[in-house]
Amino acid sequence: MSKVKTKDLLLEAGKKSFLEKGYNNSGIESILQEAGVPKGSFYHYFENKEDFGLKVLDRFAECIGERQEVLLCDESVPPLERLRNYCGMVSDALRSDECRKGCLVGNLSQEMADQSEVFRARLEEIFESWVDRYAACLKQAQVAGEVSPDLDVRELAEFWLNSWQGAVLRAKTMRSPAPLHTFLDVMFGNILSVRR
């Protein structure tokens, strides 16, 4: 098995375990079994569990960032439609497992932000990168006349992230996409629809 494939298998098994059980309840042994690789392979790629967890988080953030770039930066689509399409993609992914897993970044924020400063700082960087992308798209919507010029797009992007993460958490708790639909209805039907 190639080195790249082995590392990828470990990272994917880690993501699966963290989403299903959380970071603290995920054991290296069970991750190795899931990946089908020997124990020595783990320490070849990762210094310890925290290093592994951060690499899993980085891989997840990289994948989400790529999806955000594709969906939120496609200037052939109106800005608000891009945001709606992005939320639709995330909603579909969450519904595919009956909303049981939630968002890895949100989950790890709740679990690790007060346990590891390294995790907390990295999670905040990821959230800030998401806010940056939302704000850029919302600014384009504002320029296009889709959003009120009176709104502070950075503040709106922060509100978007905070509200969306809350909706994802509630969807996980309820095992229902209803909170996601409520978020979209209120955001697009009330907050973003007010133009001056």
Where are these regions (language model features)?
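N-terminal intrinsically disordered/low-complexity leader segments
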Residues: 1-5
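Generic hydrophobic, amphipathic alpha-helix propensity
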Residues: 6-14, 31, 56-60, 64, ...
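Helix-turn-helix
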Residues: 9, 17-51, 55
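Amphipathic, non-transmembrane alpha-helical scaffold segments
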Residues: 11, 57, 61, 120-131, ...
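Hydrophobic alpha-helical connector segments
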Residues: 55, 70-101, 153-160
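Amphipathic alpha-helical segments used for helix-helix packing
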Residues: 82, 97-118
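C-terminal peripheral helix-coil segments that are non-catalytic and often amphipathic
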Residues: 85-93, 128-144, 154, 158, ...
